[in-house]
Amino acid sequence: MTWLKLKKQCSKITLNPFCYVTYSLQTASIVMVFLLLLQAALLVATKSYRSLILAVATVAASLVAEAFFRLTHKEVSEDTWSICIAQGLLTGLLLPNLCSVYATFFLTLFSFMFCKFVFGNFSSSWANCSVLAVAVIYFLDSSCFPQAAVSLADLQSKNPSLHLIQSGTLPILKTDSSLTAFLNENAFSHFGSMIPEGYASFFWDNGSAIPAFRFNLLTIVSSLVIFSFGFADTVIPAVFLFVYAALVRFVSPAFVSGVAFQGDILLALLTGGTLFCAVYLLQWHGSVPTTFWGKVFYGVLAGVAAFFIVGCGTSSVGFVFLVLAMNTISPLIQKTEEELLCSSAVKRLRFRLKGNRD
């Protein structure tokens, strides 16, 4: 937080002994759990009970791992219970519905305990336990993860997402026609443009086997809540999405011999969990830089890495390995931040000491 924001936040005189400049960790984690439970509620509404059971199994595994960690470590913050529930929900939502429930529980339990005991609990860990668990499950049973739905021929066309909709690869809601007509008449017509049928369904539920990738509209609304109320910082997600979208739009056609500068941004953002990753995974507590320019560099690097790891969309595990890759790079960025801040502080101190002598 900048000094100007801090000064504005603390400008009111009250009888309270402390002034909080941001929400507590427990409050932020409870909000995250609530928003993730909305994703689970849509699983119930769409009768995706298998995915819901997997989410329950991963939450149970996360809580068991936390309870065992607390038995062996005395000084553990009480705030981590809500964080454990959030981590369990994230893990379950990132898994396809074909995974075995029993295997998912035990592999998640093993991954979380390994992460806690080897790397440290919560913010002490440089690795995201949720994506680590998904990566372990993927390596042991990659067959349950769906293959990329887009082909090279699709990417060479001008509008791959529309082609997937028209071919039936992406499901269309029964109310899509009326909803599209309503949006065109009341919204897009004022800007002189129209959207074809299928895009409303694309935003609402793209039918992915992985729950975290399905409900893009809910993820967008959730991001507005998280970022508008200051539960998370906007720098890394904003820079990441801008860099990744720009590379998909202008650079990706050169790799697939497609139409120049006509890469499909919607396909890249609305499939493969791009938005979900940007909101919930990419800047997990303790795994990102702390300074503004460190966050900008982290976001740029993540956008470039996503372009080469994830590609142009529809990947089922690309963002899992993206987050793990950024987790390994982030400590180097944080170390550089510390050295630069220390060097800057030493220079200012020497300048002040020299001024006092004069």
Question: Which residues does each PLM region occupy?
Answer:
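A beta-strand-loop signature enriched in Asp, Gly, Thr, and Trp
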Residues: V248-F292
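N-terminal signal-anchor module of multipass membrane proteins
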Residues: M1-L71, C342-D358
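Structural signature of hydrophobic alpha-helical transmembrane segments
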Residues: S48-A60, L98-F106, F203-L217, F261-T274
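Membrane-water interface at loop-to-transmembrane-helix junctions
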Residues: L25-S29, E197-V221, V225-T234, Q262-G263, ...
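Loop-to-transmembrane alpha-helix initiation sites
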Residues: W126-V131, I265-T274, K295, C312-M326
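Cytoplasmic-side transmembrane-helix entry/capping segments in multi-pass membrane proteins
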Residues: S77-Q87, A103-L107, S124-V134, T234-F242, ...
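Hydrophobic, membrane-inserted alpha-helices
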Residues: L35-L42, S62-E66, C84-L93, T108-C115, ...
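Long hydrophobic alpha-helical segments that form multi-pass transmembrane helix bundles
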Residues: S124-I220
